[in-house]
Amino acid sequence: MKKVLLTLAALGSLSATQAQQAGSWLIQGGMTRIAPSVSSGTLSAPSPSGTTVDVGADNQVTAQVTYVVDQNWALAVPLGLGFKHKLYGTGSIAGVGQIGTVSALPLSVFAQYRFGESNAKFRPYAMLGLSYAYFHDAQGSATLNSLNPLNPVGGSTGLKVDSKFALSPGLGMAYQLDDRWFVDFSYAKSLLKTTTTLSTGQSINTTLNPAIITLGIGMRY
């Protein structure tokens, strides 16, 4: 009986170690919050002088697939259906409220360096990602229509937000619950700038630099 117990214990230890070897896949699901930290330029003329903008945060259900390259290195690809952000007037038009919306689909790949032994229960990591922020379905609100001096009577002001590449450095931590299940938390900052152009010709440059905060639970394969 004692030999059987020792054998089972050894197998359990072996499976925990093998599960984190090169070639393992980590599949997780959870929530991601994208919160822009906006530094806005001013809207070009003709427009109210000093017109600037802010961009609201959004939370969505997301997933992530990670491939373990070796004991320390891994490649992670976040997955999701995208985010929808509200646009607000600031500066000389502060207080007017929402002036539009834009949908964003971030396409990213992250290289992670995981500290500690491969079979450790707690592993912090540093990461660097390349992200492509695909902006689509940007729409101006009735408030923007009324503020735009070039908007035709009864018409609407369209928006186009340029899609851009950005580097995304970050930190994270993973905690192994058992041989297969784990909890993962990460924080990244995407160094993102873009330009928004109105259908009537005015444009505005913005530094978005969104924080990307993800909490997930997953399984190791």
Q: What spans do the regions from the language model cover?
A:
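Flexible, solvent-exposed loop segments that connect beta-strands
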Residues: 39-53, 83-102, 134-163, 192-206
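Predominantly the C-terminal beta-signal and adjacent terminal strand-loop region
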Residues: 84-88, 178-221
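Residues that define the transmembrane beta-barrel architecture of outer-membrane proteins
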Residues: 23, 57-61, 101-107, 122, ...
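Gram-negative (and chloroplast) outer-membrane scaffold detector with strong preference
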Residues: 35-37, 64-144, 210-221
